[in-house]
């Protein structure tokens, strides 16, 4: 057994995702002696943290065994580290990824991969022509609840799928009295902000894999909270949408619906719930729990529900049990991509899949502007 080391550049390391997900999970892999490979070797990631604030970077690095750090992307690209992870603001991502490709780095980035589908596909083609391996984070289907939902779909539990419904969001404070839970760039178009651009990336791969590929979209969006306060306590005008509602046509004939808002107070099991209805049964899943109702367990609710206390609609739902411990979804993404690099194991969410996610957001924006249904065309290199 040999130890193999692989340098990973994390750009945006001091941000929430960079610190709590990417850095934390890569350090956990290293702390456990590395990622075991098929030949018995262990792959140990070594980090190079990149950000704009030297003070924050220095403190972060010192708090985690004195990791290497720099405020210069040029310096990072000149280093021998082989992988570039970008989890900084979306707006300037294409430029940074192009620099990384020119430096010969393998690309593994957060979604959305670019502000527009044309830019996203350009990155995919550029990385492919350079002979580099590339991928995008798709973490949600590794969450326990959605993993169970995917297993049900793959097992044929639903029979013919009729519909899929996504209900997601929560109240994001405006920063006046309580700190905003999302960075201010999320609300600025020029910096890659917008709820649809951010979250359609998830809904695309989730619905494609849970139910059927999306072939049409019709959307409606709004800006519910027009003014917010940024990280420095300064008010700013919001020019990006914070609500997104969409109807979808799926390839298998099913219908999809997305209700997504950063200005809602949820009364449901989770901030993010996906329900699939089929001829043989239904299932509803949040991030951590999943419930099913088979055709045989379906109550007669149409008339009974009209009477007070007539029927308990929650009673016929059964929770899907856990089958074992679950790893952090981002760690599972990293392990899969590191194996892709080290031993050519498959990694399906390439930059083309990332572009498909941006495509759905692009078409949703066009649907709003043109007030009509948009066809979702196939994307290929």
Place the predicted regions along the sequence by residue:
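Short glycine-/small-residue-rich Rossmann-like dinucleotide-binding loops
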Residues: 88-89, 260
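Predominantly a Rossmann-like dinucleotide-binding segment in NAD(P)-dependent oxidoreductases
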Residues: 140-238, 371
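Short acidic low-complexity segments
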Residues: 38-39, 68-79
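C-terminal capping/lid region of NAD(P)-dependent oxidoreductase domains
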Residues: 159-163, 366-381
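Beta-strand-loop-alpha-helix segment that lines the small-molecule cofactor/substrate pocket
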Residues: 81-83, 89, 94-141, 156
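N-terminal Rossmann-like dinucleotide-binding module
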Residues: 1-64
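Glycine-rich, aromatic-lined ligand/substrate-binding cores of catalytic
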Residues: 198, 209-216, 221-224, 229, ...
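C-terminal glycine/acidic-rich active-site capping loop/insertion
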Residues: 229-231, 236-237, 245, 249-250, ...
């Amino acid at each position: 057994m040999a130890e193999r080391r692989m340098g990973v550049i994390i750009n945006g390391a001091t941000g929430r995702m960079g610190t709590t997900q990417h850095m934390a999970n890569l350090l956990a892999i290293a702390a456990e002696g590395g990622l075991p490979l098929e030949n018995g070797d262990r792959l140990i990631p070594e980090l190079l943290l990149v950000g704009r604030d030297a003070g924050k970077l220095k403190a972060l690095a010192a708090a985690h065994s004195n990791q290497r750090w720099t405020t210069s992307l040029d310096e990072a690209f000149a280093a021998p580290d082989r992988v570039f992870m970008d989890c900084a603001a979306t707006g300037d991502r294409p430029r940074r990824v192009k620099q990384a490709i020119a430096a010969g780095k393998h690309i593994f980035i957060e979604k959305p991969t670019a502000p527009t589908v044309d830019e996203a596909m350009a990155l995919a083609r550029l990385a492919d022509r350079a002979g580099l391996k590339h991928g995008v984070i798709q973490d949600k289907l590794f969450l326990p609840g959605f993993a169970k939902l995917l297993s049900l779909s793959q097992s044929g539990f639903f029979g013919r799928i009729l519909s899929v419904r996504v209900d997601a969001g929560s109240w994001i404070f405006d920063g006046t009295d309580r700190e905003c839970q999302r960075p201010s760039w999320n609300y600025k178009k020029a910096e890659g902000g917008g709820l649809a651009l951010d979250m359609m990336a998830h809904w695309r791969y989730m619905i494609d894999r849970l139910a059927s590929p999306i072939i049409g979209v019709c959307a409606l969006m709004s800006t519910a909270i027009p003014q917010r306060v940024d990280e420095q306590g300064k008010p700013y005008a919001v020019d990006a949408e914070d609500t997104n509602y969409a109807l979808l046509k799926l390839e298998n004939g099913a219908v999809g619906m997305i209700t997504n808002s950063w200005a809602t107070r949820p009364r449901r099991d989770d901030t993010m719930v996906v329900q699939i209805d089929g001829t043989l049964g239904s299932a509803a899943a949040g991030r951590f729990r999943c419930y099913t109702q088979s055709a045989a367990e379906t109550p007669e609710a149409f008339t009974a529900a009209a009477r007070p206390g007539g029927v308990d609609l929650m009673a016929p739902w059964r929770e899907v049990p856990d089958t074992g411990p679950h790893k952090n979804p981002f760690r599972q993404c990293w392990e899969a991509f590191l194996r892709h690099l080290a031993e050519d194991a498959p990694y399906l969410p390439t930059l083309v899949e990332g572009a498909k996610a941006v495509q759905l957001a692009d078409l949703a924006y066009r649907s709003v502007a043109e007030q009509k249904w948009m066809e979702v065309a196939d994307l290929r290199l």
